[in-house]
Amino acid sequence: MKAELIAVGTEILTGQIVNTNAQFLSEKMAELGIDVYFQTAVGDNEERLLSVITTASQRSDLVILCGGLGPTKDDLTKQTLAKYLRRDLVYDEQACQKLDDFFAKRKPSSRTPNNERQAQVIEGSIPLPNKTGLAVGGFITVDGISYVVLPGPPSELKPMVNEELVPLLSKQYSTLYSKVLRFFGIGESQLVTVLSDFIENQTDPTIAPYAKTGEVTLRLSTKTENQALADKKLGQLEAQLLSRKTLEGQPLADVFYGYGEDNSLARETFELLVKYDKSITAAESLTAGLFQSTLASFPGASQVFNGGFVTYSMEEKAKMLGLPLEELKSHGVVSAYTAEGMAEQARLLTGADIGVSLTGVAGPDMLEEQPAGTVFIGLATQNKVESIKVLISGRSRLDVCYIATLHAFNMVRKTLLKLENLL
């Protein structure tokens, strides 16, 4: 099956926003075994949009349009597609009810007539409910070509795709089953080298490596009759892959941490904290609260996290955490001493089971004769205080902070897994 993605919105063409939906949708289609052959961006213009739809319909089996479902005059995706298909627009009852519920809590004047457009679908289409917004999506097949309309905001598009479109397409088209393995602590080039014979000789299942910021994923895919057979084939391949060793002789299984396209080190760590009923706190310097905000983003975070510290300057480390200022000056803020002291004091001051700290040089300049990207991460429990030194070179400030946070979550995760092995 050949698919085409059409992003609708003048703001994409003028560079006001980045079309991240294309990457997300391409990944989702790949998971389903649907080949995306073309990606197009078009402005808010009916004539040009009609031309793009016409071209897509002549060369693709599945046409996915994103954006232009809102209430304003330049939101014309559904109207233009309906015109092309010679279909009327009708109101979806569920979407109308959502509009009623939404505006019932607001001033009557806020419900202008143009808002009703968001509840319209093309006659004969399958509505795709919008869990996080008001504009309903839709799926329709005409003359052997399937068309999908999706909202533009990623916060609305992603839930609609994951919860509505993917299950729908899976029933109709997909025979491809996939499993995503996630790795941290090994680069893509080394992982590909270690698994080169598997990758070069692959048939079915297939192996596709992807480099992410600070980590790597492997997508294992197979075409088979059902999920049970797929699980067996993919499970056998996974076991073979994880039995390999890195170039340093470390078992590849040691740098594997979980499954799933939407998984993360933070999520794995959070779930282990919940599982073992352990609380955590953090004292952050260069990351300025990134570790804590990531942890707090998970529903139920209050089960394991009550609060922590952001101590950017040396003086605040002394003031808020009670670390001796003269010792901080002697050892420097970019040091194992400071990282371990921050972690232990944070743990003691909050009564948490685990204390984590991050201190270092985000860059681009050196600090205390340490190069940019030098990070010390401390971890304190009731029985032990330790730290690791990480060098994240050749990265932007944002990447240094993000990857440092990944290292911190991984350090906590490994500590909790050791606890698991002792139970």
From Swiss-Prot:
InterPro entries: CinA (IPR050101), CinA-like_C (IPR036653), CinA_C (IPR008136), CinA_KH (IPR041424), Competence-induced_CinA (IPR008135), MoaB/Mog-like_dom_sf (IPR036425), MoaB/Mog_dom (IPR001453). Transmembrane segments: none annotated. Disulfide bonds: none annotated. Gene3D superfamilies: 3.30.70.2860, CinA-like, MoaB/Mog-like domain. CDD domains: cinA. Coiled coil: none annotated. Belongs to the CinA family. PANTHER family: NICOTINAMIDE-NUCLEOTIDE AMIDOHYDROLASE PNCC (PTHR13939), NMN AMIDOHYDROLASE-LIKE PROTEIN YFAY (PTHR13939:SF0). This is Putative competence-damage inducible protein.
